Curated annotation (Swiss-Prot):
Molecular function as annotated in GO: RNA binding; rRNA (cytosine-C5-)-methyltransferase activity
UniProt cross-references to Pfam families, sorted A to Z: Methyltr_RsmB-F, Methyltr_RsmF_N, Methyltranf_PUA, YebU_pre-PUA_dom
EC number: 2.1.1.178
Reaction(s) the record says it catalyses: cytidine(1407) in 16S rRNA + S-adenosyl-L-methionine = 5-methylcytidine(1407) in 16S rRNA + S-adenosyl-L-homocysteine + H(+)
Enzyme class label: transferase
InterPro entries membership: Methyltr_RsmF_N, MeTrfase_RsmB-F_NOP2_cat, MeTrfase_RsmB-F_NOP2_dom, Nol1_Nop2_Fmu_2, Nop2p, RCMT, rRNA_ssu_MeTfrase_F, RsmB/NOL1/NOP2-like_CS
Binding annotation for S-adenosyl-L-methionine: 125-131, 149, 176, 194
Protein name, UniProt field: Ribosomal RNA small subunit methyltransferase F
Subcellular location: Cytoplasm
Keywords: Cytoplasm, Methyltransferase, RNA-binding, rRNA processing, S-adenosyl-L-methionine, Transferase
Species annotation: Escherichia fergusonii (strain ATCC 35469 / DSM 13698 / CCUG 18766 / IAM 14443 / JCM 21226 / LMG 7866 / NBRC 102419 / NCTC 12128 / CDC 0568-73)
Active site: 247
């Protein structure tokens, strides 16, 4: 694999020499940083099993190497990357996999280690969505996830990735993560804080990542991280699990932040060792039981992961002074809900008791039941999935609901050829050789729902959202 030139400040190299365990070679560290990062993907088990995914993609000649800490994760090598970007493959467009760096799969593995099965989870810094979607898959779309993102521009990307992967148990918020300890005290069974950091571990992906690096900025970032972990710890229920992670390598932003929390709440913080998380985890194990992953250990990004348990309650923070405002949705009455369920089922959309129908004007939404306890305590950017808009003739079913709820085994499902599926993703109407009988047609490709079409004569009218329409070369190789 080709080398690339990474910029290293002298002070950074000095700091790394001091931070690196004697069991590791500094020369190996420098050599690893100069190698471009291996591509990796995670199979979305909400839509397809790992075995079926491997069978589906076998004809492509992809080389898939299992990632030790994530059963559904693989390093991937492809001969046709220049001809067809991974993000333009049919399997990516339909949400069968997520392009995710291997080491960033570690925090969620730690969160669910030792049979942990939380019902309400918060992802404090969630965009672009790799870990939120991984959490949702581990929860099998059950329970509830609060996915927060401080950056307004990244909330849209977060929602797009959640929708593509067919996730239905998520509420999105847009706040500084430091508000949650006061706003939602002891509300979560598990919390992932993948903290904003100096990014020292990402030089293999971005050779200029350290251009603005300084020891002073590390100190400033660590101060923010302490405030974030303190807030997250207050939002965690007693007995709950907190995973703290970064993609940086200095101790100030990693071990020191966790040790500060333990010093602050000595009777409430228990470190849970990660040495048995996967075979070979001991190579990155610190004396505290954390994983400090230097890039040469597993040939991945530099990363840090700590897992801890809240053993008892701690004094509450002052209640927030802001007003949430009136919640604009009302629950749908049982009788009407039954009619909506019946109409949805006729086009292949079904859901279970983990979701409940709510209405706002002519909009119908499905919210995860597990998030209802948070209503009135925090303002949501987006909650659950938009099911439909009502109109005089019935319901206008929404694309995100089709991707999250549709069963490809529905009698009205219509499987497209590769050429017709590509037309669909380009936003064009489809003219199949033999038109289906039903007026509302669940469109599938590779036995996966990719949208809902209206049959008009021999034409299937495209309803693919304009913002998702793709140009350029797609999976059939035609531009």
């Amino acid at each position: 694999m080709a080398q690339h030139t990474v910029y290293f400040p002298d002070a950074f190299l000095t700091q790394m020499r001091e931070a690196m365990p004697s069991t590791l070679s500094f020369d190996d560290f420098l050599a690893a940083c100069q190698r471009p990062l291996r591509r990796s993907i995670r199979v979305n088990t909400l839509k397809i099993s790992v075995a079926d995914f491997l069978q589906l993609t076998a004809p492509y000649g992809w080389t898939l190497t299992p990632i030790p800490w994530c059963e559904e994760g693989f390093w991937i090598e492809r001969d046709d990357e220049d001809a067809l970007p991974l993000g333009s493959t049919a399997e990516h467009l339909s949400g069968l996999f997520y392009i995710q760096e291997a080491s960033s799969m570690l925090p969620v593995a730690a969160l669910f280690a030792d049979g942990n099965s939380p019902q309400r989870v918060m992802d404090v810094a969630a965009a672009p969505g790799s870990k939120t979607t991984q959490i949702a898959a581990r929860m099998n779309n059950e329970g509830a996830i609060l996915a927060n993102e401080f950056s307004a521009s990244r909330v849209k990307v977060l929602h797009a990735n959640i929708s593509r992967c067919g996730i239905r148990n998520v509420a999105l918020t847009h706040f500084d993560g430091r508000v949650f300890g006061a706003a939602l005290p002891e509300m979560f069974d598990a919390i992932l804080l993948d903290a904003p950091c100096s990014g020292e571990g990402v030089v293999r992906k971005d050779p200029d990542a350290l251009k603005n690096w300084s020891p002073e900025s590390n100190q400033e970032i660590a101060a923010t991280q302490r405030e974030l972990i303190d807030s997250a710890f207050h939002a965690l229920r007693p007995g709950g699990t907190l995973v703290y992670s970064t993609c940086t390598l200095n101790r100030e932003e990693n071990e020191a932040v966790c040790l500060w929390l333990k010093e602050t709440y000595p009777d409430a913080v228990e470190f849970l060792p990660l040495g048995d998380l996967f075979p070979g985890a001991d190579k990155a194990l610190t004396e505290e039981g954390f994983l400090h992953v230097f890039p040469q250990i597993y040939d991945c990004e530099g990363f840090f992961v700590a897992r801890l348990r809240k053993t008892q309650a701690i004094p509450a923070l002052p209640a927030p002074k802001y007003k949430v405002g009136n919640f604009p949705f009302i629950p749908v009455k049982n009788r009407e809900a039954g009619q909506i369920c019946q109409a949805a089922a006729s086009v292949g959309l079904t859901w279970d008791e983990n979701l409940r129908l709510w209405q706002r004007d002519k909009e119908l939404w499905l919210f995860p039941v597990g998030i209802e306890a948070l209503i009135g305590k925090v303002r949501f950017s987006r909650l659950g999935i938009k099911l439909a808009e009502t109109h005089n003739k019935g319901y206008r079913w929404q694309h995100e609901a089709v991707i999250a709820l549709a069963s490809p085994d529905n009698v009205n499902a219509f499987e497209l050829t590769p050429q017709k599926a590509e037309e669909w993703y380009r936003g064009r109407d489809v003219y199949p050789q033999a038109a289906p009988v039903a007026d509302d047609v669940l469109v599938t490709f590779q036995h996966q729902p990719i949208g809902l079409a209206k049959r008009i004569g021999s034409r299937l009218k495209n309803s693919y959202p304009r913002e998702l329409v793709r140009d350029g070369k797609l999976f059939t190789g035609n531009a």
